Amino acid sequence: MAADISESSGADCKGDPRNSAKLDADYPLRVLYCGVCSLPTEYCEYMPDVAKCRQWLEKNFPNEFAKLTVENSPKQEAGISEGQGTAGEEEEKKKQKRGGRGQIKQKKKTVPQKVTIAKIPRAKKKYVTRVCGLATFEIDLKEAQRFFAQKFSCGASVTGEDEIIIQGDFTDDIIDVIQEKWPEVDDDSIEDLGEVKK
């Protein structure tokens, strides 16, 4: 007797998936997906490109489009039939106005293009060479730092936003090396400051 009660109470439950199945539906269901937004056509109205989705549906599946327009409210249908082509064009123009430019880049301040080289004393008889101004010629400082470290077989590091420190006294050789590696840096734009204190 208890088995009969549990079976009958299970059939009356609202959340039972067996009761939610439609009797007139043919399983497995065939769902039509939109070619514009890739969602089922019932959900196209929730996407930002409703006009494009409707145009695609009308062009490719006129029967389904007719069903959807009959099911829609008269306000939506009237809005679409009045200016279907112009509404889509207006939406497209609005989107182009809103998003096209992206982030505006700030103009760089015109800084004189000058490379300065200085020899800075460290402890006892040791020196470091400071190279400033390579960034004004749009030279990648990390690449320049690696190049100097490899060329002079020493340590080099990028310390400031436009400053490279090379361990050792290379003020004599570095001018020729810079002009050889980066020909856009001419002899007039390189200035040797000599020995400078930190």
Swiss-Prot record:
Family affiliation: Belongs to the DENR family.
Taxonomic lineage of the native organism: Eukaryota, Metazoa, Chordata, Craniata, Vertebrata
Species in which this protein is naturally found: Homo sapiens
Protein name per the record: Density-regulated protein
Record-listed N-acetylalanine modification sites: A2
SUPFAM superfamilies documented for this protein: eIF1-like
Modified positions (Phosphoserine) in chain numbering: S20, S73, S189
PANTHER family assigned to the protein according to its UniProt record, in alphabetical order: DENSITY-REGULATED PROTEIN, DENSITY-REGULATED PROTEIN HOMOLOG
Subcellular location: Cytoplasm
Domain SUI1: 115-182
Biased composition (Basic residues): 95-110
Main function: Translation regulator forming a complex with MCTS1 to promote translation reinitiation. Translation reinitiation is the process where the small ribosomal subunit remains attached to the mRNA following termination of translation of a regulatory upstream ORF (uORF), and resume scanning on the same mRNA molecule to initiate translation of a downstream ORF, usually the main ORF (mORF). The MCTS1/DENR complex is pivotal to two linked mechanisms essential for translation reinitiation.
Biological-process GO terms, alphabetical: formation of translation preinitiation complex; IRES-dependent viral translational initiation; ribosome disassembly; translation reinitiation
GO molecular function, one term: translation initiation factor activity
The keyword Nucleotide-binding is annotated on this UniProt entry: no
